[in-house]
Amino acid sequence: MLRDGNEGMFTIPGFSQIQFEGFCRFINQGLMEEFNKFPKIEDTDQEIEFKLFVETYQLAEPLIKERDAVYESLTYSSELYVLAGLIWKTNRDMKEQTVFIGNIPLMNSLGTFIVNGIYRIVINQILQSPGIYYRSELDHNGISVYTSTIISDWGGRSELEIDRKARIWARVSRKQKISILVLLSAMGLNLREILDNVCYPEIFLSFLNDKEKKKIGSKENAILEFYQQFACVGGDPVFSESLCKELQKKFFQQRCELGRIGRRNINQRLNLDIPHNNTFLLPRDVLAAADHLIGMKFGMGTLDDMNHLKNKRIRSVADLLQDQFGLALVRLENAVRGTISGAIRHKLIPTPQNLVTSTSLTTTYESFFGLHPLSQVLDRTNPLTQIVHGRKLSYLGPGGVTGRTASFRIRDIHPSHYGRICPIDTSEGINVGLIGSLAIHVRIGHWGSIETPFYEISERSKEKEARMIYLSPSRDEYYMIAAGNSLALNRGIQEEQVVPARYRQEFLTIAWEQVHLRSIFPFQYFSIGASLIPFIEHNDANRALMSSNMQRQAVPLSRSEKCIVGTGLERQAALDSGVSVIAEHEGKVISTDTHQIVFSGNGNTLNIPLVMYQRSNKNTCMHQKPQVQRGKYVKKGQILADGAATVGGELALGKNVLVAYMPWEGYNFEDAVLISERLVYSDIYTSFHIRKYEIQTHMTSQGPERITNEIPHLEAHLLRNLDRNGIVMLGSWVETGDILVGKLTPQIANESSYAPEDRLLRAILGIQVSTAKETSLKLPIGGRGRVIDVRWIQKKGGSSYNPEIIRVYILQKREIKVGDKVAGRHGNKGIISKILPRQDMPYLQDGTPVDMVFNPLGVPSRMNVGQIFECSLGLAGDLLNRHYRIAPFDERYEQEASRKLVFSELYEASKQTKNPWVFEPEYPGKSKIFDGRTGDPFEQAVLIGKSYILKLIHQVDDKIHGRSSGHYALVTQQPLRGRAKQGGQRVGEMEVWALEGFGVAHILQEMLTYKSDHIRARQEVLGTTIIGGTIVNPEDAPESFRLLVRELRSLALELNHFLVSEKNFQINRKEA
């Protein structure tokens, strides 16, 4: 697709556009395609016919708003109606009714779905494109074996291979292979037709012996031979019509369905002209594939690169939703058939509405969004995370690879990724290279290809007819694309004579006159995360990868601040995330408060509600703050309210703080960070977190559970925050152990469940004491905070399957503390090791104390020098009150451009502020600073500046854990693992060696017995500790040893052990 003029040349497409386009394609095309496959349904006697008039389908307006769907834990969906007809063939009577097919979840303005009140997103999957691929592999003798692989639309594979004697075999499974002549005969060709339609008939005749002639003597023989190999059946099967139909269905229709994309690819690869609507493998395809394979054997033709993007396709949200819709219609068809036959059997008169149930479609989509690996809960840590999540690209999932089986070649960067898939942004760990991110300019083409725009350079471009062209990966090899050229579109600027360029997957240096296309934007090759890193060209790629991942983990702060040094993409990232409120047209602000903005324009008055302390699924606080004043006039597109982590419509994930790169008493050893107490007391890095606690009331066999504030046997101060209904009051401050919701569960009354005083009351006074069990919702450890919302969701019907749900939301204010993780935008991460009083921090020559001290040894070995440029330029920007937005790769315009920019700005800041220490020519960028404890200057000059530092979601409050008592595993009798289960720390093999090395025998014995799995000994410890007695050494073996003995017994091995007495060394036999 070509676009005339410079329109859109520097306009970045919406970051959620790919999701929107995919869903629109599903609604406009996918639904109709699947409806057209729905067959006419007849009963067994062919008296009644049921059909859908699919041209008249309707999608109704959603019954609830997005916000209500989230609040009430419902699905934001639309009801699908279609006209259905029931025809009685005997009298040609027809009954038409509009039937309700089911609910289809709708995409909202964020490009996500709301299912059961939870934001979910569908990830794009990248798969091998259906078609035919030629490869060469070495066999065990080191001889090249040429194979052609035919991949079907659903991922099934069939292979043709040619051996040393030029015989061609068809391999339908890994073990079984048959002659290609048998396959072609089974597909309906005779020998004469085969030989007439191939280029090398003599090769086919060369491996035709008497045995082969007998196999392909008739179509029946060929089908029997093929069925025997394909179905792996023994004996001699007999030819029958049912066998022929089974083979036709299982192999030729299922295994060999190419789909529209597969048919197009095979036509292009084999130079065929078969119509696109013929989506199954034909004998003509197999003959052409065999001819190409023979050509490969003798050195003609080119092999295919399986990892080239032209051989991949994107399975977008449209394809996944369409597949599920087709599956639901198949289920609906089976249900209608069953209902029709049941109605006729019981002599009932069916109607279309009685035949169609909505459960097929609704349950299919519910299970898809709930269980499918490509449907994920939207990560809403911050606005950047939301938009990046929708642009992920996964090789995993159904039909793809797995993290354990994927080869290095699949994970690696390929030249065809240039401008399409970001070479930097991928996950770390086992899925590295398998989960990528789309570059910012790409779009998904009609055939599932990834297209990227380039600016065309032609003779006509001199006549002001510049064009932008979207290039698919299959067309790359026809063009020379300039890679490192400057982006000036002004014709007057003379381009370099020689430029680096890309041609046929190689990077060359060519003359400017030979270039066909040039890149349109410096960020064109990167994803959003990588495009937000300033001076990325000065960083090692591994650190840039860490940075793009860590920006997604940044916590929105209570007082956001935009970065001094940025890349210019911050505004669009904030805009497309949907967290800000933007004026849709110009008008006047009538009133504004924290809850809503009343805005008049175009003759209408709009009430715009603002998000107030909304919890994200990562427990961060999503909040909108009005940015306009009453009575002000606003223009279209102006920011009315900022969201979490945005300032003035720009992304603001962190804070600009004064940093120094120097060692300080070992407190910044191994990436630790030393910070000033100013960051705590001035709420610089304070963030709000909202935790959700919920409880359900069920209908038990003894009666319903009750919500009440009258709970026996509990101290009054634990119930102090409950209202008369037994639910915590809004605005209450709650501590660990407090009751949030009081609940009593009825249980069977038996004598053993009564306390002694209850039995006395019942015997003397005849008072019936309640036997309900207390099952209240208590605040767990680390949950203290302020109650900001309570929701009581009462489902209709109130049955045991639809329990009432009570949710309590508690707001926590968290200052930065020792153990929290902070990071810059260059992969420079660290843990807070010490918080110093501000008077002890190093201070500058004007007396300003430093906020953070980083280790200078973290820079040279990691090669992320971009942080040094950002740090120094940030200092200049702070002193000059300027903000910089710098595109990457500025060295393309001038050598050392970044360094010159930074030094010139520092020099100007030094002149304007009359502070010569800001830029000292002897050590530019560095300055002499003073020790806050002694007032003496440090020996060497230190690099100081303003860096943009983020606080990450990995906080010590969520990680720190100690176990006093807790649960034990049933088999090993050892403490469980993990903070959530109140687990313990494992003393493993290597820890035991370490303790042995120090000779601490008693500590080691305690860890392996009392504190772990010696059941009797650990019970005795408590009693002896309370009375102050001595803890006796256990004389029998711990449970883990007894478990080993029992496991050996199961293998018929008896193991006895003996304990040697310390007194007389007599051996006492002890049974295990």
Curated annotation (Swiss-Prot):
EC number(s) on file: 2.7.7.6
Biological process according to GO: DNA-templated transcription
One Pfam family hit: RNA_pol_Rpb2_6
Gene Ontology molecular function: DNA binding; DNA-directed RNA polymerase activity; ribonucleoside binding
UniProt keyword annotation of Cytoplasm present: no
InterPro entries to which the protein is assigned, alphabetical: DNA-dir_RNA_pol_bsu_ext_1_sf, DNA-dir_RNA_pol_su2, DNA-dir_RNAP_su2_dom, DNA-dir_RNAP_su2_hyb_sf, RNA_pol_bsu_bac, RNA_pol_bsu_CS, RNA_pol_bsu_protrusion, RNA_pol_Rpb2_2
Subunit structure: In plastids the minimal PEP RNA polymerase catalytic core is composed of four subunits: alpha, beta, beta', and beta''. When a (nuclear-encoded) sigma factor is associated with the core the holoenzyme is formed, which can initiate transcription.
UniProt record similarity statement: Belongs to the RNA polymerase beta chain family.
NCBIfam families: PRK00405.1
Described purpose of this protein according to its UniProt entry: DNA-dependent RNA polymerase catalyzes the transcription of DNA into RNA using the four ribonucleoside triphosphates as substrates.
Protein name: DNA-directed RNA polymerase subunit beta
